[in-house]
């Protein structure tokens, strides 16, 4: 594929130079690079038909793809579209039980032992670093970055899958974190609908307006501290400098946590904090402030007040969209997280499942075409968006109670894809704004990509974090201890990981 592109460019360059020679009587100047617009130029009629870009669809090959069997209804129409576009690439499907934690790692280990690894893995939501360290994954650096369409993929979506300067995976299913707003309550309380580029000051003003005798401003502000510990270029949440591979809770998390603590100190602002202190079994006491205001209904459901019209907003994520559509008794929509101030963008946290080629992939060129189709490719995304847009809200996946997805968030910011996403009748104005905010995306699920995450954020560290969130300790007092614990553990995990990758 690359060879004929080079041949086309050289032929066109020669034709143009000959034209200059005949017109001006000058010797053509030798050059090693074709003009910038050569790939868009129409070839001269030489009697021979030049290869067309569409010839990539004539590529031959065979690809075996493995995916969680619970996602069959979602992926099969997308694979059928690929087969129609690439009729000479055989796609063999291998569904497997991939719904449990560690299922992907276990499946790969089993197929390695049987010498039968698939060529492509799709929708891996497990810890990815161990798969790289085990040598299960193919380096796609050259395949990806030599493709012009790769420039439309924000670096925040590929950086997490880059180890030792090599890219090993691509995001294939993405969910964004943001705010969900009760549109009915906005009207009832005569609150002006905020813009999607709102600031933290506007957010605070609005959430306070949601406090009445019967309602709260927020059902939950969970994750607000994590999100605002990473509102800067080069950071993931919580408070992780991924360039220097170091956590900084003291300088990044403390200010964010202090802001959250101030909001939670406002009487009646957040239902979540009204449940604390909880009982030893982690249930809400009947003597709690929550029960005093709302009764026992939903006392242990963090989103109950939002679902039932008793809260103006809540922090949320699109991975909750399925049950939100099923259970919410109000009209609602998404908003991006507010900007820190008017001079900064919103760095929207994303949760991502990935897809990748395996190290035993027999035909990387053909397999990469399918990988591209399922991840960032423009044509694959446009066709997949059409497939999802054609669905009606309320359709279930097979015999399950799971609703079919009526939209998905593409992992590219290509203008054609962005426009197509917004045209979907199932995509609301707020959801479109949330998707557009992904130009500046940060990872909110670093447990999937940082080696040994669970050994870093162990019970001791989580207890320290929760003591602050529940109002039992001060962030500034606890943060240095957290930094010392997590950075020491991180250094140990990185050393072990890098040693294994380098073997």
Residue ranges and their predicted role:
Residues 84, 145-146, 162-283, 359-365, ...:
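Helix-loop-helix "hinge/cap" segment bordering the ligand-binding cleft or interdomain interface
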Residues 324-328, 343-349, 357-459, 501-502:
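C-terminal lobe and pocket-closing loops
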Residues 81-155, 187-190, 303-313, 326:
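Extracytoplasmic "Venus flytrap"/periplasmic binding protein-like
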Residues 109, 119, 149-185, 214-219, ...:
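A structural signal for short loop-to-beta-strand junctions that line the ligand-binding cleft
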Residues 99-103, 220, 235-343, 347-348, ...:
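Extracytoplasmic ligand-binding clamshell segments of periplasmic binding protein
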Residues 48-54, 123-176, 333-336:
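Hinge/lid segment of periplasmic solute-binding proteins
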Residues 54-70, 89-95, 119-120, 168:
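Short, well-ordered beta-strand elements
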Residues 51-57, 69-90, 457, 461:
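Short, polar/charged alpha-helical segment
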């Amino acid at each position: 594929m690359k060879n004929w592109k080079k041949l086309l460019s050289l032929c066109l360059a020669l034709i143009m130079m000959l034209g200059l020679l005949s017109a001006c009587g000058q010797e053509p100047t030798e050059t090693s690079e074709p003009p910038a617009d050569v790939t868009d130029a129409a070839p001269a009629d030489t009697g021979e038909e030049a290869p067309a870009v569409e010839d990539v669809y004539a590529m031959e090959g065979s690809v075996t793809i493995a995916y969680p069997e619970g996602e069959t209804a979602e992926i099969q129409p997308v694979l059928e579209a690929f087969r129609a576009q690439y009729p000479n690439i055989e796609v063999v499907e291998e569904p497997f039980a991939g719904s449990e934690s560690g299922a992907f790692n276990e499946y790969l280990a089993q197929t390695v032992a049987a010498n039968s690894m698939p060529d492509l893995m799709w929708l891996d939501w497990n810890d990815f670093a161990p798969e790289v360290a085990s040598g299960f994954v193919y380096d796609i650096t050259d395949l990806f970055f030599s493709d012009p369409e790769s420039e439309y993929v924000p670096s925040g979506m590929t950086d997490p899958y880059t180890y030792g300067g090599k890219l090993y995976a691509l995001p294939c299913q993405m969910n964004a974190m943001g705010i969900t707003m009760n549109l009915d309550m906005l009207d009832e309380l005569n609150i002006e609908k905020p813009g999607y580029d709102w600031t933290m000051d506007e957010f605070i003003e609005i959430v306070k307006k949601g406090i009445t005798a019967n309602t709260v401003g927020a059902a939950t502000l969970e994750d607000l501290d994590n999100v605002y510990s990473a509102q800067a270029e080069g950071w993931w949440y919580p408070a992780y400098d991924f360039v220097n591979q170091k956590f900084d809770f003291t300088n990044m998390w403390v200010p964010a946590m202090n802001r959250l603590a101030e909001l939670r100190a406002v009487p009646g602002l957040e239902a979540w904090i009204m449940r604390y202190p909880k009982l030893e079994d982690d249930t809400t006491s009947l003597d709690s402030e929550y029960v005093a205001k709302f009764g026992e209904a939903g006392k242990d459901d963090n989103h109950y007040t939002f679902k039932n019209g008793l809260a103006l907003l809540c922090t949320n994520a699109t991975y909750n969209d399925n049950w939100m559509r099923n259970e919410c008794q109000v009209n609602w929509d998404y908003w991006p997280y507010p900007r820190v101030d008017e001079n900064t963008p919103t760095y929207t946290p994303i949760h991502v499942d990935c897809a990748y080629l395996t190290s035993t992939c027999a035909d990387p060129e053909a397999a990469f075409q399918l990988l591209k189709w399922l991840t960032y490719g423009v044509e694959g995304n446009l066709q997949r968006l059409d497939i999802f847009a054609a669905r009606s809200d309320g359709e279930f996946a097979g015999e399950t109670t799971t609703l079919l997805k009526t939209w998905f968030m593409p992992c590219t910011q290509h203008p054609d894809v962005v426009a197509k996403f917004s045209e979907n009748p199932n995509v609301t104005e707020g959801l479109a704004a949330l998707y557009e905010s992904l130009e500046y995306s940060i990872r909110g699920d670093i447990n999937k990509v940082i080696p040994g995450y669970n050994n870093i954020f162990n019970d001791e560290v989580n207890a320290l974090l929760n003591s602050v969130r529940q109002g039992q300790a001060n962030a500034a007092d606890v943060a240095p201890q957290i930094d010392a614990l997590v950075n020491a553990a991180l250094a140990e995990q990185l050393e072990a990981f890098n040693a294994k990758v380098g073997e």
